[in-house]
Amino acid sequence: MKVSVLGPAGSYSEIAAKSLFSVICSRTAPHIFFTSSIENAVLRLFENDENGETANFAVIPVENSIEGAVGVSMDLLLEKDVCIVAELILPISHCLFVSKETAHLSGFSLDQIQTVYSHPQGIFQCRSFISSRLPISETVETDSTSKAAKIVAAINPAEKICAAIASEAAGKEYDLEALHFNIQSIPNNSTRFVLVMRSDSRKMTQKVNGSDFYMLPEYFSQTGSGSVFYKTSLAITPKNDRPGALFQILEAFNNFKINLTRIESRPSKRVLGEYFFFIDFEGNPSDSNCAQALSLVFERSASVKILGTYGRILPDRQ
């Protein structure tokens, strides 16, 4: 099983990928492909690497409890021919690391740290700690938190004293010294990751108004041990030639007592003021109420893209 994630090793995306497969497909350990960006992780589903290999799956972050939606991921779900097959909510715990050489310097203290490296979200999520404990340090953004850890591991403290904000896994991967744990400003920090694959690789199980809905691959349900319930994700463009268009779409879910778990807007990038709406709801199209609600949604929308019907791994099984 080949899975592409944002790297390098020790990233939260890698942690999410391993956690997902340990629950939904415990007999198959994934082979992780590390990429330099979220976009490249998805492109690996379609493009060969230097060894002529493509990935079967990609794991990407779509939403953080502090920062909200991950825009690049939402755009990729909309633009690429992929579907969601599972999701996982991963608790995010940031740590402050320095190299062991730095930690063992005589008289070393936080005041000596000149530069702090991390992903932009890592920096933002730890802004209170940075402002209070590292007020004179420069912050430098990296492609991922694990990339920050890798950079710090390679810097000679004789040249510059620097630190990284990253996961415990990244600290272990690059043999760094942890100075502080759980430095995020809000303790209940979590990120929603989704497992995606090419739509043409899925086994189609049902059509609604001519659009394909995809269920979990058979080997997930055969080997899985996690407690799951189904969710369905859509990307919708309302009809903009009449008032109350979005209300009428949402009314369809309310009429059939369908619980919505997320509504998120995203610019269409075509015309100012035109938006796609990402909608997640509990259930799958084989349920009578869901099927009837979806029929109305199709009637009342200018366009509907099915992003997937999939299992959500419950927190008590992670």
Functional labels for PLM-detected ranges:
Residues 1-318:
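Domain-level signature for soluble enzymes in the chorismate/prephenate branch of the shikimate pathway
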